[in-house]
Amino acid sequence: MTDKRKDGSGKLLYCSFCGKSQHEVRKLIAGPSVYICDECVDLCNDIIREEIKELVPHRERNALPTPHEIRQHLDDYVIGQETAKKVLAVAVYNHYKRLRNGDTSNGVELGKSNILLIGPTGSGKTLLAETLARYLDVPFTMADATTLTEAGYVGEDVENIIQKLLQKCDYDVQKAQRGIVYIDEIDKISRKSDNPSITRDVSGEGVQQALLKLIEGTIAAVPPQGGRKHPQQEFLQVDTSKILFICGGAFAGLDKVIGQRLNTSTGIGFSAKVKGESEKATEGELLAQAEPEDLIKFGLIPEFIGRLPVVATLSELSEEALIQILKEPKNALTKQYQALFNLEGVDLEFRSEALTAIAKKAMVRKTGARGLRSIVEGALLDTMYDLPSMENVGKVVVDESVVNGQSAPLLIYSKPDAQVSGE
């Protein structure tokens, strides 16, 4: 490599590609009788990157996984929710098959199938969407429906969702149009009341109306910097009909709406059949019977429900399922903490009764799988604080008493004569 000096013969050196002298560039790289400057190297890299981007969609189309393959991958990361995984696998496969073959097949227009996930907090709605996007290697972004408002009001515009998706793929419109958008807390934008009000519902029905076109498919004009504060900027045109929208929510109280409908259909008065405690359906069983009319009664407008034709319900996770979640998935929580401790050169062991205690705590808190990390973090906090300052610790053992806060983890030292229990 040469610097900005003449060579041994006193001759001024020039880039063989752009013709700039060594005084006009930062570096010249020498080859056999040729030179290339740093600017030309950067330009070559940009050209190669652009060509690779053009090849990616073709490669993705040829590698579209089958519903069985999608389901198998979800099984590696998500415990339970078998029906929801099957529904998602088919819907995602059909969506990307539609993109691969265009919007029509033999003259038949293929409709867009967005997805609605209904299930309690911590049941795996967000994890399913994230895992799908990661497996398919497509851009993914999340939005919180509670922060969205109608255009012109304080809050996020619905177009900001697409702007976030563009950010995830460096404003590559073609790549963004193959992405997945997950809108969480969709139940929180339900209509506040069935009765018309003088006060405009800018965060409820108004947001549903604003989301309609975006979810169904429209050409969204999105500024690179987001918002409407810079109208002079050139807007990016994004076709949202190619983006898969997955909406999720807990829909607290929907089970009661469904229960009322089912009870009404069994008769009233003396002809009504009174069910015993053993015959009463669980919340998960009721949610699985959700119909569009129930969602309308809950507060979603009919047009919005029509844009989400694929509905999958997730049941509340049992204690056994939570124990499986702790130890079985590829990125299970216990495996994550074991990897963290291994970075300190220490083994970490969770005894079976400890996993049961963690699951029981999560059940009491009603936080589902989402609450598992905070419980494990609380049990290991003091140990993780002290461990980097300690020497000769070879293993840390967590049992039920540690999870319940009755004792500290058992520390096993690498020296045989130095085994102690927690302080």
UniProtKB/Swiss-Prot annotation:
GO terms for MF: ATP binding; ATP hydrolysis activity; ATP-dependent protein folding chaperone; protein dimerization activity; unfolded protein binding; zinc ion binding
PROSITE patterns noted in UniProt: CLPX_ZB
GO biological process: cell division; proteolysis involved in protein catabolic process
CC annotations in GO: HslUV protease complex
Binding site for Zn(2+): 15, 18, 37, 40
Start and end residues of each ClpX-type ZB domain: 2-56
Coiled coil (UniProt feature): none
Alphabetized InterPro entries for the sequence: AAA+_ATPase (IPR003593), ATP-dep_Clp_protease_ClpX (IPR050052), ATPase_AAA_core (IPR003959), Clp_ATPase_C (IPR019489), Clp_protease_ATP-bd_su_ClpX (IPR004487), ClpX_bact (IPR046425), P-loop_NTPase (IPR027417), Znf_CppX_C4 (IPR010603)
Keywords annotated in UniProt: ATP-binding, Chaperone, Metal-binding, Nucleotide-binding, Zinc
SUPFAM superfamilies reported in the protein's UniProt record: Glucocorticoid receptor-like (DNA-binding domain), P-loop containing nucleoside triphosphate hydrolases
Cited CDD domains: RecA-like_ClpX
Transmembrane segments: none
Keyword hit for Iron: no
Similarity annotation: Belongs to the ClpX chaperone family.
Subunit-level organization: Component of the ClpX-ClpP complex. Forms a hexameric ring that, in the presence of ATP, binds to fourteen ClpP subunits assembled into a disk-like structure with a central cavity, resembling the structure of eukaryotic proteasomes.
PANTHER family xrefs: ATP-DEPENDENT CLP PROTEASE ATP-BINDING SUBUNIT CLPX-LIKE, MITOCHONDRIAL, ATP-DEPENDENT CLP PROTEASE ATP-BINDING SUBUNIT CLPX-LIKE, MITOCHONDRIAL-RELATED
Protein name listed in UniProt: ATP-dependent Clp protease ATP-binding subunit ClpX
Lineage: Bacteria, Pseudomonadati, Pseudomonadota, Gammaproteobacteria, Enterobacterales
Originating gene: clpX
